[in-house]
């Protein structure tokens, strides 16, 4: 079984990383999230989370970010190849419960996994 850690190397942290991913990446979406993804430059998958102020107050935005990061931490092994992913929250996700968000992320990551095969 793989590691369930979420280290700094597995995060998109700098603006140029997000911009580069936006330029070279593919997009998939569902009712609550948009994912921009591209094959990773390194050997590990990396996650970025974008939740704008349109989604809700700070408490709501932080809850959504925690939910996305936790889902990635537990399910990163399901990605077939190393992928850089930026998950963008839509306004519709602000009033949903965590299990529904996890199901939505599951659907999204399945589509990312299918689209990331080389």
Swiss-Prot record:
List its EC numbers: 3.1.26.5
**What PROSITE patterns does this protein's entry cite?**
RIBONUCLEASE_P
Cellular component annotations (GO), alphabetically ordered: ribonuclease P complex
Q: Which SUPFAM superfamilies is this protein grouped with?
A: Ribosomal protein S5 domain 2-like
The cross-references to InterPro entries, in alphabetical order and at most eight, read: Ribosomal_Su5_D2-typ_SF (IPR020568), Ribsml_uS5_D2-typ_fold_subgr (IPR014721), RNase_P (IPR000100), RNase_P_CS (IPR020539)
| Keywords attached to this entry | Endonuclease, Hydrolase, Nuclease, RNA-binding, tRNA processing
Hydrolase as a keyword of this entry, yes or no, is yes
Tagged with keyword tRNA processing? yes
- Single Gene Ontology BP annotation: tRNA 5'-leader removal
| Superkingdom of this protein's organism | Bacteria
* Known catalytic reactions: Endonucleolytic cleavage of RNA, removing 5'-extranucleotides from tRNA precursor
Question: Molecular function (GO) terms listed?
Answer: 3'-tRNA processing endoribonuclease activity; ribonuclease P activity; tRNA binding
What is the annotated quaternary arrangement, including any partners?
A: Consists of a catalytic RNA component (M1 or rnpB) and a protein subunit.
What the protein does comes down to:
RNaseP catalyzes the removal of the 5'-leader sequence from pre-tRNA to produce the mature 5'-terminus. It can also cleave other RNA substrates such as 4.5S RNA. The protein component plays an auxiliary but essential role in vivo by binding to the 5'-leader sequence and broadening the substrate specificity of the ribozyme.
What protein family is recorded? Belongs to the RnpA family.
Q: What is this protein called?
A: Ribonuclease P protein component
- Give the species this sequence originates from: Desulfatibacillum aliphaticivorans
